[in-house]
Amino acid sequence: ILKVERTIINLMQRTSGIATQTNKLVKKVGKNVLVVPTRKTQWGLVDKKAVTLGGGGTHRLGLYDWILIKDNHIKLSDPKSYVISPKSFWEIECKTKSQVLKYVKQKPDAIMFDNFKPESIKKIIKQIGKTNIIFEASGNITEKNITSYAKSGVNVISLGSLTHSVKSLDISLDII
């Protein structure tokens, strides 16, 4: 036990901290919005499992899950030129209202609002109207403002802070 004690305790502290923080945020946003981590994880699948144990969901587990078109891809070529299988799930990251309104016409499975204010998201979603597109908020979302994002009409809220800057719980081992 003593040979692996520190490693096991470190892992337990980290994953317990992630699960606890996730659970706190899940309770704040309610049942209609899914709280997920971003891909910014130190321990990959271990961190993502901790999020699910806390009541959250997972974003992508890897590049094989779905296609995520980010700003760098958009700068290199127009997403209209991409050949995407109708069976593929794809999401596009948008940084401006004009991008959202442009790409919503291409009927992606999901649109990520990157660094938008909750009020802006709410207005844009209202302007788009009823759709089957999943809306995700990401960027600069904190425990203090997460409820505003949850009320904006999004289906998913992704936070890098769930895994890259969570406070580990204080756990120790006593042998009796």
Predicted regions: what they are:
Residues 1-106, 110, 119-127, 133-136, ...:
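Acidic/glycine-rich phosphate/pyrophosphate-binding loops and surrounding catalytic core
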Residues 115, 139, 161:
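Short secondary-structure boundary segments
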